[in-house]
Design a protein with these regions (language model features):
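N-terminal module-boundary/linker segments of secreted carbohydrate-active enzymes
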Residues: 25-85, 98
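...with weaker cross-activation on analogous glycine-rich loops/strands in unrelated enzymes
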Residues: 144-211
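Short loop/turn segments at secondary-structure transitions that flank enzyme active sites
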Residues: 114, 205, 221
Length: 264
């Protein structure tokens, strides 16, 4: 009788755990910044993983210091209202949009430019437009001039120009600050738009050598920069696990080829 009672209690506990997990997947796992992290670097790595600095440690530190909006914050559109598919958002970056043209590639350029501007390297801020012409920032330390430069840049640059300007990187060498990017012209078929997302953090398991990474993106129409949620992870973690030998990756809902990883 005691054995039957123990089995019953065990089955009851398993059922309660299953129900709790189901409720969490349906509700808790879609909550933005569920643990109220203050900045991107507060997001814990997968168990056994350690953050890496990459070839540009200062850029890695800058990205990890990006402030996050509080628990439950929604991705808002520049024009007002909230974006669709909020479940794709793991955490909203607390950085006000500059214009309705600040979309996917623009976000990648902005984060790079913000890093250089905040580091006092204003002379290093330059990007190419869709015709291959270099657009240089020449406004010095003026924040107003810097933001005006970015607004103008958004109108002449795109996923096409960014994919041509950045240098290719092997998946195995992925680092913070890298960009997954493709232009519509590179994809025959129904693809009307290109897309770009930035790798904002990378962690490595020293025992296995495996890597995981965080992504941040903007999108069309212009919306808050946000850390992407990995929908393939059963716990809805924002970390994407890297398969170095993969020919392609599905990052949230966007497909990328292995050779579409780039770096500044």
């Amino acid at each position: 009788m005691k054995v039957i009672k123990r089995i019953f209690v065990l089955l009851l506990l398993v059922a309660l755990l299953a129900i709790s997990y189901g409720v969490w997947v349906l509700y808790g796992s879609t909550t933005s910044n569920p643990h109220n992290y203050r900045c991107l670097g507060d997001i814990p790595t997968p168990y056994g993983y350690q953050r890496i600095m990459g070839d540009d440690p200062d850029f890695s530190v800058f990205l990890r210091s990006l402030p996050l909006k509080g628990k439950g914050a929604e991705v808002e559109l520049f024009t007002g209202g909230t974006a669709r598919f909020q479940s794709l958002n793991y955490a909203v970056v607390n950085l006000p949009l500059l214009s309705n043209a600040e979309q996917c590639a623009d976000v990648c350029m902005r984060l790079r430019a913000e890093y250089l501007y905040n580091k006092g390297l204003c002379g290093s801020i330059h990007f190419k437009d869709v015709n291959g012409k270099t657009i240089r920032y020449q406004g010095g330390s003026s924040r107003k001039a810097f933001e005006r430069y970015l607004r103008n840049l958004y109108g002449v640059a795109s996923t096409f120009s960014l994919s041509r300007e950045l240098k290719q990187r092997r998946l195995a060498d992925i680092q913070p600050g890298d960009v997954f990017v493709y232009a519509a012209v590179d994809r025959p078929g129904p693809h009307k738009y290109g897309h770009a997302v930035m790798v904002v953090d990378v962690a490595r398991n020293p025992r296995t050598g495996k890597k995981a990474f965080l992504l941040a993106e903007g999108n069309t129409p212009a919306r808050n920069i946000h850390v992407m949620r990995n929908l393939e992870n059963p716990f809805r973690s924002p970390w994407f696990m890297l398969d170095e030998d993969a020919e392609g990756l599905i990052l949230s809902v966007f497909p990328y080829k292995a050779n579409e990883l780039r770096h500044f």
